[in-house]
Amino acid sequence: MKLIVSLIILNLGYPLTLESTLFAENFKKPLFLCPHPSEKNIFFVVEQGGLIWKIKNKVKSNKPFINLKSKVHKPIIPGDERGLLGLALPPNFSETKIIYVNYVNKKDETIISRINTSVFSEEILIQFKQPYFNHNGGMMAFGPDGYLYIGVGDGGSAGDPLGNAQNLTNFFGSILRIDVSANSGYKI
């Protein structure tokens, strides 16, 4: 994929200039920057240790927007891929104040949950055990079809020793698509 993108850029016929600018700072193990679905000046930063920070007009809030530190597995070794791994805001986030998160809990289980940020109530939608400390995935996003897409890693270790990515009887090595439009639970 990188090669294809590089070839496309080379064939543009004009030089490409990239500029690095500071957006916000002072995060611990930031993994993801999630834009607000309807307000262009608001973003959310996901920290692996369990915090989600709100950034408005390039200014970090004084307090975390969401604190899941008591729920997530704290990464304890270099390369540890557990903790808070993903965040998705639905298109109607401004009205519902509901977010979706992907994290590995202290029991080494992947949790996909819906959180009402107005009252901080969490509903676990999907839960399954992780066999290793890495290859857990984490990316989540809403598609133009309104479904929530969830990237699930092969469960680890190096080389996928359990063959999870080829096994259709589990979630590993998959992109899940779920309908979260109901008030509780989800549909496939």
What are these regions (language model features)?
Residues 111-119, 164-181:
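Beta-propeller blade signature
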Residues 15-159:
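Acidic, Gly/Ser/Thr-rich repeat motifs that build Ca2+-stabilized beta-propeller blades
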Residues 2-15:
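Sec-dependent N-terminal signal peptides
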Residues 181-188:
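Short acidic, Gly/Pro-enriched loop/turn segments at secondary-structure junctions
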